């Protein structure tokens, strides 16, 4: 097999995005669009990937570190000029080079592999990836002769009326013989209205030299969708989301309403899990088998075990074991570690908290910087008071502890195994094993005093 190279064009400014964020870094289903492109290329056994960067180069390099080499295009003088920046990296090498736009996040590895195969079969010096669309307005047209052989690419503004009726378009993805590409690039002119060097001109140069130029037509236009504004970004996200959701459903996940379910590309979901409408699963979240996630839930970069029921709750950068009940309206903040058979009820918030197996936090509870043992029951309104206005401190609760309602545990504090905290207590000292901790003012009833308060008839 000949050597394979790839050049990813990612230097455009993207002014139509009207954004401070560099265009190719806009996310599509949880990943910058240029990273979608590079990740697909990486599955093709490519020997070298070179990404052409320009505006926001440092940020692009951060996202693609370890996945690509980089060359900077100091001035944006057209697509041919951009590819020419890789001359020092690739010129003179035997093999084939893919050229792909970094703003086409829907392009798939299987399509690029088919393009490479077709290029090899046709013994071509250049092969254009094309597709057919109903309305080709604005796209370059593929002009073929009577035998179906590619003659040239004509830009829409330069096309005759007859040529404008052609529906086969240039997608902007190419496969070239590497040596032929860089030799032809040296002869591309900027003699045009924009004063730029255009990559399609390489096709004409090769044809004029009687080299074989082919065109591989793909079925799906959506893979070639380029993102130049927020409207196209939304469309690319919609199409990518459909692809992701259909893949999960084929693998045994029930999405009650896939059109209103938002799942990032790196999320993994087990079989027989049910995801209700309005759920957002972000980042590298992993959800096990037989779970239910109800409407309005958001789970980000978290690992969820099996048979977990998440009811309209938020989980961020946390770990949840098996057979856990969460919500409704619970909030697991980063570094929460919820063990098996735990109940996290409504309006419960945890942060940097370990919750032991079988423990119940039923409702209206805050546990931050806490370590809670097994089979603990924490009553409504209880708080691990972890912040003194300057420093955070830790609360440790042993196994088989009962914490009564409206208890304040003032950290740093430790409650021993099998201890009992009386309701309404403010605990400031450690409570030994098997002890009752009670810290509240003694009740004093003032007989007849209420008559003087005039609070009622």
UniProtKB/Swiss-Prot annotation:
Is the tRNA-binding keyword given for this protein? no
**Reactions listed under catalytic activity:** alpha-D-glucosamine 1-phosphate + acetyl-CoA = N-acetyl-alpha-D-glucosamine 1-phosphate + CoA + H(+); N-acetyl-alpha-D-glucosamine 1-phosphate + UTP + H(+) = UDP-N-acetyl-alpha-D-glucosamine + diphosphate
PROSITE patterns in alphabetical order: HEXAPEP_TRANSFERASES (PS00101)
Record-listed E.C. numbers: 2.7.7.23, 2.3.1.157
Annotated positions binding UDP-N-acetyl-alpha-D-glucosamine:
9-12, 23, 73, 78-79, 140, 155, 170, 228, 333, 351, 366, 377
Catalytic residues of the enzyme: 363 (proton acceptor)
In the UniProt record, which is one GO cellular component term? membrane
Q: Where in the cell is it found?
A: Cytoplasm
Q: Where does acetyl-CoA bind?
A: 386-387, 423, 440
Chain segments carrying region Linker: 231-251
Q: Which InterPro entries is this protein grouped with?
A: Bifunctional_GlmU, GlmU-like, GlmU_C_LbH, Hexapep, Hexapep_transf_CS, NTP_transferase_dom, Nucleotide-diphossugar_trans, Trimer_LpxA-like_sf
Q: Please indicate if the UniProt record lists Transferase as a keyword.
A: yes
Q: How is the cofactor bound?
A: Binds 1 Mg(2+) ion per subunit.
Relate the assembly described in the record: Homotrimer.
Q: Which HAMAP family match?
A: GlmU (MF_01631)
Query: Mind telling me what this protein is named?
Result: Bifunctional protein GlmU
Organism of origin is Listeria monocytogenes serotype 4b (strain CLIP80459)
Gene giving rise to this polypeptide: glmU
């Amino acid at each position: 097999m000949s050597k394979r190279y790839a050049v990813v064009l990612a230097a455009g400014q993207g002014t139509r995005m009207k954004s401070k964020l560099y265009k190719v870094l806009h996310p599509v289903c949880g990943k910058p669009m240029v990273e979608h492109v590079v990740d697909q290329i990486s599955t093709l056994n490519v020997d070298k990937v070179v990404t052409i960067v320009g505006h926001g180069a440092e940020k692009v390099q951060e996202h693609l570190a370890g996945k690509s080499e980089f060359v900077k295009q100091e001035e944006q003088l057209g697509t041919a000029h951009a590819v020419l920046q890789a001359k020092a990296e690739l010129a003179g090498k035997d093999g084939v080079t893919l050229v792909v736009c970094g703003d086409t996040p829907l392009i798939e590895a299987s399509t690029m592999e088919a393009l490479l195969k077709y290029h090899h079969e046709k013994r071509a010096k250049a092969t254009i990836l094309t597709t057919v669309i109903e309305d080709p307005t604005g796209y370059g047209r593929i002009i073929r002769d009577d035998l179906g052989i590619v003659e040239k690419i004509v830009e829409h503004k330069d096309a005759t009326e007859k040529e404008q009726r052609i529906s086969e378009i240039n997608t902007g993805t190419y496969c070239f013989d590497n040596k032929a590409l860089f030799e032809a690039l040296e002869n591309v002119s900027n003699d045009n209205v924009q004063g730029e060097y255009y990559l399609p001109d390489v096709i004409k140069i090769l044809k004029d030299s009687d080299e074989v130029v082919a065109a591989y037509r793909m079925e799906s236009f959506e893979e070639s969708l380029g993102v130049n504004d927020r409207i196209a970004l939304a469309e690319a996200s919609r199409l990518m989301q459909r692809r992701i959701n259909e893949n999960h459903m084929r693998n045994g996940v029930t999405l009650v309403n896939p059109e209103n379910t938002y799942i990032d590309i790196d999320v993994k979901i087990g079989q027989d899990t049910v995801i209700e409408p309005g759920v957002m699963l972000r980042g590298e979240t992993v959800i096990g088998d037989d779970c239910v996630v109800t409407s309005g839930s958001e789970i980000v970069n978290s690992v969820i075990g099996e048979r977990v029921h998440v009811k309209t709750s938020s989980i961020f950068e946390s770990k949840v074991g098996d057979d856990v009940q969460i919500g409704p309206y619970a909030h697991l903040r980063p570094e929460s570690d919820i063990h098996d058979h735990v109940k996290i009820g409504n309006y419960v918030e945890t942060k940097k908290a370990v919750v032991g197996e079988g423990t119940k936090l039923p409702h209206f509870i805050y546990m931050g910087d806490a370590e809670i043992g097994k089979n603990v029951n924490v009553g409504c309104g209880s708080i691990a008071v972890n912040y003194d206005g300057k420093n955070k401190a830790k609360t440790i609760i042993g196994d088989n502890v009962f914490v009564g309602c409206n208890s304040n545990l003032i950290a740093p504090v430790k409650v021993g195994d099998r201890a009992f905290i009386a309701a309404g207590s403010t605990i400031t000292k450690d409570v030994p094993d098997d002890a009752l901790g009670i810290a509240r003012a003694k009740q004093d009833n003032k007989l007849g005093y209420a008559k003087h308060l005039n609070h009622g008839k």
